[in-house]
Amino acid sequence: FCIGVGREGMMTRAFAMRLMHMGKEIHWIWDDTTPSIGEGDLLIATLGDGRIGHINYICERAKEAGAMIYVVTGSPSGDTAKNVADKVFFVPAAVYRGTDDVVPSFQPMGNLFEQCLLILFDIIIMTIVDETPGLTFEKMSKNHRNVE
């Protein structure tokens, strides 16, 4: 399961799409067809500034249901990272409304964090492909939507 909002959410949704291309069962929390979450499930949440209330709420509910919570953030001092997450992945890049000591950027708002998310997620995908015998980009492309 994945969750994010705004442009951070778009980067996270792109990650979910690639996981689906790999044949993984993946659900975007906001979709109406998302099943219940529970024991043995993983929720990956992106929240740049660490203070997105409704994402914190969903992470708390998922944790209560038995899911593991991984948080990718530019602000590890946020409530979700400190109080809910099982694992925190700190991306030290400027985020929208961020307050932590991170790599500054002249780009507007949270661009640097969003760009770093996309690169991080692509590296994770490439690593999984490299470490999965028989998984190729050609096989992944067979799971690409074919009604475009």
Model-found features: residue ranges?
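Glycine-rich phosphate-binding loops that contact phosphosugars or nucleotide phosphates
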Residues: 2-119, 126
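A short, charged, Gly/Pro-tolerant segment at domain boundaries
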Residues: 123, 129-148
